[in-house]
Each structure stands twice: as C-alpha cells, then as structure tokens.
Amino acid sequence: MQNQGQDKYQQAFADLEPLSSTDGSFLGSSLQAQQQREHMRTKVLQDLDKVNLRLKSAKTKVSVRESNGSLQLRATLPIKPGDKDTNGTGRKQYNLSLNIPANLDGLKTAEEEAYELGKLIARKTFEWNDKYLGKEATKKDSQTIGDLLEKFAEEYFKTHKRTTKSEHTFFYYFSRTQRYTNSKDLATAENLINSIEQIDKEWARYNAARAISAFCITFNIEIDLSQYSKMPDRNSRNIPTDAEILSGITKFEDYLVTRGNQVNEDVKDSWQLWRWTYGMLAVFGLRPREIFINPNIDWWLSKENIDLTWKVDKECKTGERQALPLHKEWIDEFDLRNPKYLEMLATAISKKDKTNHAEITALTQRISWWFRKVELDFKPYDLRHAWAIRAHILGIPIKAAADNLGHSMQVHTQTYQRWFSLDMRKLAINQALTKRNEFEVIREENAKLQIENERLRMEIEKLKMEIAYKNS
C-alpha cells in the first residue's frame, strides 16, 4: 500500500509518538485520531508559511491560506461578475476555492496555481472563468461513494501515522463503509445518512456511523451524525463461571475423540492451538487480537518471567502492557507454557501477512469458529468479561483490574457492571455476607476476650491485695 507519495506523509509523522493507549473507548480512539490530524495540520501550516515566503520573494501578488481543511488562493482581482464594486476601484480581494485539500500534496498544487494566477495578474490577462468561479470545484464534488472508497486508504494515511493499529482501524472503517453504502450513490451527506437509516440492527447502525464519520472527515464532507453517537444497550451475554470455564476446556479433547478419522494430516493437531488460545483468554482476560499481534513468546517461556505475565504488544488496541493472570494455577492445569503450543502459534502467525488486516482478523475469527465447533455456550470475548467479574468478586481494586485489561476505569465500570448475572450477583453478595459474618464473629470474640482480660486483671489485683495483707 505504501508508495513514494505516501512516504512523505509518514516521514512527517516520524517525530510523533501516538497516544500509547486509547483506553478502549470510542472517545479514546477519537482523541488519538485527533492528535494525529492536529500533528499533520501543524506540519502543513509550517510548510504553508514557507510557500508564502517563496511567493512573496518571487513578488507574486498571490498568497495561499488554509480554511476548513482546504487551501485557498488569496489575491486582489477584478470585480467578480454579479459582485458590487463597493470601493469604486474595480478591484477587490478574493479567496478562491479550487477544491485543493490542506495536505502536503495540496500545498504543491496550491503553490503551482498561485504562480499561474500571479502571471495572469501581472500580464493583466485574468478573467473569471469556471475554474476561478468555483464551478469546476463543484463538478469535482460530484463524486460517487465508490470513487472515494478507491482513494480512501491513500487519503486516510495522509492524516494518520501508519502502524499495525491504524491499519486495523482503517480496515474497520473501510469494510463497514463499503458494506453499508451504495458505491454508485453520490458522496453527499444526505445519501450517507440514508444509508445509515436503512440499517435495522442498532449495533450495526452505530458501527456504520462510526465508520462513515471517519470517511467524511477524510474527504471533508460536512455531515451531522450526532444522533447515532450514543452507544446502544448491550445484549445479554452468557458469562461463564469458573466451573464452566474448567469444563469448557475439556470440550477440545472431546472433539478429538468425536471428530472421526477423515482429517487432513496438516491440520489434525490444530485443535491444540485453539485449546491453548482458550486457556490464555481465560487466564489473562485478553482481547483475542492481543494473542496474535507480535506475541513475545520468548518472554512468556522465559525463566525470568516469575510473575507469569503476558506482554501485550504496543501495536494492539490500547498499547503495550503486561497482563497478570487470575487463577495462576490454571497456567499449569491448562499447560499454557508448553513450547509445542507456542511453536504452533508462531507458525500460524508466520503464514499471515501482518500488513493485511483481513488475514489477522481471520485468525481472531477462527477462535469464534472453534468455540462453535466444540459446542461452547459462550463466545471468546465472554472469557474477558468473566475475568473482569472474577476480579471484582475477588476484591481486586477497579483501577488494577482496568489496567490489567487495558482500558480506563470508566470503560471498565460501564462495560462490566452490566454483565453481572443473577448467579454472579448471588455469589458476590454471599461472599460479602460471609466476610461480614466473619467480621462479626471476630468482633464478638474480641469483646469476650476484653471481658476475660478485665476479669483476669481484677483477679490479679485481688491476689496482690491478699499477699500484701498476709505480709503486713
């Protein structure tokens, strides 16, 4: 996907360190994208100053300015047809919009156009034509959604640093915009909103709006999608208990027994990788993608890894972190540090093109396929929710649990508090009552001990008095 034209944009991002964590929320992702857009805008404005210095040095009576994501030519010109000559000079200062985007390529185009306009002014041959009246720009605006989708990647990475994470985000935006819009429709706000309105499912509509919003920002299409910005209520989930998780992992061995003999020799042992993946999701509460993006296998198997942490790579959704296990004994019970399984992981990843996010996504989707294959009653992400709920029940502070899962405290509480099932709530309440009962017992025993201590103190005082009396 990269070429020389794109290189200069990525070079402009060389001194930018993107926010290491988006906190897992849409707001966090938006702030990260905004940081990168502002960084690129600063670079463009710096280069714009240089362009205007060159134009001034060449005594060109034209300057370039930025306005709302576009570049305009500013010059004093003959009165435009239909305009009033308020000063009586026959001339007036105008800002000409030629549909030039405010990016590095646009600066080059704008500078060339400024020199061309300057020559017309100097020769006194300027005339108001379709180009300078903005009519050609209007024609250019009449592009279809399909036309813009073809240029989406090129334009998107003019304002975003290219990383594994941003490639994945772009794939998300592109695929949903392509899926939910008609490529033959003109790329207008009205048509894009109509596309969203035709989506029946609430979550699909919400996700489509997020993607189309990014599409519109990229192509400077004015659109109001605020009515679709509220996250829908979550559907109910089947969050597994610890007992169900322990039972679930045995279903992979059950599959081995029941699958039959007609199995391709190359994949006959592949179930072991997905059993291992199941175990890692359960123990660490990982996002499925965090297993497959640049896994630090050497660290996982290292003797120095005494805390048995899994290192999540910086290219993942919320940056790098070390995830700690809950139920550390499951690591041995599930045989998660067996080099054989890690070798299978490395082999599976090596067969994929890391720059092709459809292929990485295919790996994570394969987990869901195996969950259905072995007839588990829950989904991969439910193991992450189970980790969060288990942490809460065990009394782990919200901040520590949120950090371990790689998101903010706000996301943690908003996301996971709602998943407490009746059984989970009963367990949490019973454990709290048990702790309270234990406290009451200790308090009663302490009160009894205080009474006994007071009785013994008085007994000692009495004995002292008797001894003193006998010796007198």
Swiss-Prot record:
Q: Which UniProt keywords apply?
A: DNA excision, DNA recombination, Heterocyst
InterPro entries associated with the record: DNA_brk_join_enz, Integrase-like_cat_sf, Integrase_catalytic
Q: Which residues form the active site?
A: R287, K317, R384, H407, Y416
Which GO BP terms, alphabetically?
DNA integration; DNA recombination; DNA repair; heterocyst development; nitrogen fixation
Q: Which PROSITE patterns match?
A: TYR_RECOMBINASE
**GO terms for molecular function, please?**
DNA binding; endonuclease activity
TM ranges: none
Belongs to which family?
Answer: Belongs to the XisA/XisC recombinase family.
Identify this protein by name: Excisase A
- Origin species, per record, is Nostoc sp. (strain PCC 7120 / SAG 25.82 / UTEX 2576)
